[in-house]
Amino acid sequence: MSRRVVLAGGSGFIGSFLREKIARDYDIVVLTRSPHEDDGDVTQVRWDWRTLGEWTRELDGARALINLSGRSVNCRYNARNRRDILESRVETTRILGEAIARSREPPPVWLNASTATIYKHTFDRLMDEATGEIGATPEAKDGFSIEVACAWEQTLNEARTPATRKVALRTAMVFAASEGGVYRTLRSLTRWGLGGSIAGGHQFISWIHEEDFCRAVEWLIEHDDFTGPVNVASPNPIPQREMMRIIRRECGVPFGLPATRWMLEVAAFVHRTEAELIIKSRRVVPSLLLAAGFQFRFPRMEDAVREIEDRL
């Protein structure tokens, strides 16, 4: 069987480290709007994520398709950004589904990005694939995020790909050492003395170490009994104040100033982002992965943060 994996969104934060790690086991083809001639062993192919073209040939006989495309949500949700966030997810998913449907030899599996934010804001309930409740909560101001997540998965579900199983990666915050991710932001805040609890710090944070994310992706490619939504998250979500305590300890910072909700709202406005990213309580667990025997190398945040800090 071919070892070619086609990766859309391979130049973003998650795609960049994913392609590096899985390139040991697969031949990677990255679909990108701006191909580079020199990218090691990775092949880059041009696409515009809106129309069919020569790039569709890469799907014929491929082992898998992974779609991580989508504009970053780390921005203010004004009208233009809302449109870009939604379209960049829905349209890439739509055109990839159309390409698979037309393929002479379609890939047997399609992993499409989604988000753990699809679940309701909750403090006291674990959200898994079978019993998790989907929907917006006014307290968390997450209506737009839920709208995007549902439209994203609906587009995936509507794609007619009978020979290709489809998996929606409901991914939590990915902790990684590279620039551009949430961990480096939290680390910087901690070193500035701002790594305290936010809005009380009781909201749960769902997260996953970058290595476990990549291993889960490979697992889902190779285990063909998976289909539909899969939570890609550590089995141990923790309160935000506990997360910051761990980061402070590993960074050698003795204290962190707390922030109220209104302070967070002001800071989010100044930094051109949304407070929802921190306020919402996400208590997501990966029941399907655990039931199938997937072993997390970093199930506890203490170990995940320590491993990342050892590389920084």
How would you describe each model-predicted region?
Residues R187-G196, H202-P237:
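Alpha-helical substrate-binding/gating segment
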Residues T137-K166:
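Active-site Tyr-X1-5-Lys
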Residues L220-R272, R306-L312:
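Mid/C-terminal beta-alpha module of Rossmann-like enzyme folds, strongest
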Residues R94-D142:
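Conserved Rossmann-fold NAD(P)-dependent oxidoreductase catalytic core, especially the SDR/UDP-sugar
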Residues H36-T92:
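NAD(P)H-binding glycine-rich loop region in Rossmannoid oxidoreductase-like domains
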